[in-house]
Amino acid sequence: MSLGLVGRKVGMTRIFTAEGDSIPVTVVDVSDNRVTQIKTVETDGYTAVQVAFGSRRASRVTKPLAGHLAKAGVEAGEILKEFRIDAAKAAELSNGAIVGPDLFEVGQKVDVQGVSIGKGYAGTIKRYNFGSGRASHGNSRSHNVPGSIGMAQDPGRVFPGKRMTGHMGDVTVTVQNLEIARIDAERKLLLVKGAIPGAKGGKVFVTPAVKTKGAK
């Protein structure tokens, strides 16, 4: 139950430490995070903060959403995201408030959620790291086949979850315990150590890590 930020994946680069070590980082733009609604137990049954990110033309906003944003006095955003927080933290915020990168600090562990890059239809070797069959010595036209997918009459079906060919990627992925290597407060950028899910320009959600115990 912690407040997070909505960001846009800019791309990857590297930074250098004082010792000269090269650290690969992903640049995340977290500008224009603005509060559009504060939900409370009394009115909504739970406590949360709704945040808008980015911009959207007024002609592309539905009338109910336009009324909702007008009530908060906030411009339409490209995306709305809700974060569950405690009542004490919610009391410190108000509609229209800007939430910036100062929410985090350098060295803090965070979880980053995004939609992975779609790879299209893929075989089991690419999708699940299956091994190929033998190149020769009795193998004819069965070099990259997945093999058996089950038994015969008993049980007479393919078990759910069987790893087979299919669409790869384009799914929601959360990478946990990434470290914030640097914060550019002026340009409102987070530099996260390592890679995060998604393509350049993709939307990501950055929240404080929930499994910090034992994290390296």
From Swiss-Prot:
UniProt entry tagged with the keyword Nucleotidyltransferase: no
Record GO terms (molecular function): rRNA binding; structural constituent of ribosome
Highest taxon of source: Bacteria
Annotated keywords: Methylation, Ribonucleoprotein, Ribosomal protein, RNA-binding, rRNA-binding
PTM info: Methylated by PrmB.
Record-level GO BP terms: translation
Claim: rRNA processing is one of the keywords in the record: no
InterPro entries (UniProt xref): Ribosomal_uL3, Ribosomal_uL3_bac/org-type, Ribosomal_uL3_CS, Transl_B-barrel_sf
GO cellular component, one term: cytosolic large ribosomal subunit
Modified residues (N5-methylglutamine): 153
Family: Belongs to the universal ribosomal protein uL3 family.
The protein's assembly and partners: Part of the 50S ribosomal subunit. Forms a cluster with proteins L14 and L19.
Function: One of the primary rRNA binding proteins, it binds directly near the 3'-end of the 23S rRNA, where it nucleates assembly of the 50S subunit.
Protein name listed in UniProt: Large ribosomal subunit protein uL3
Organism: Burkholderia multivorans (strain ATCC 17616 / 249)
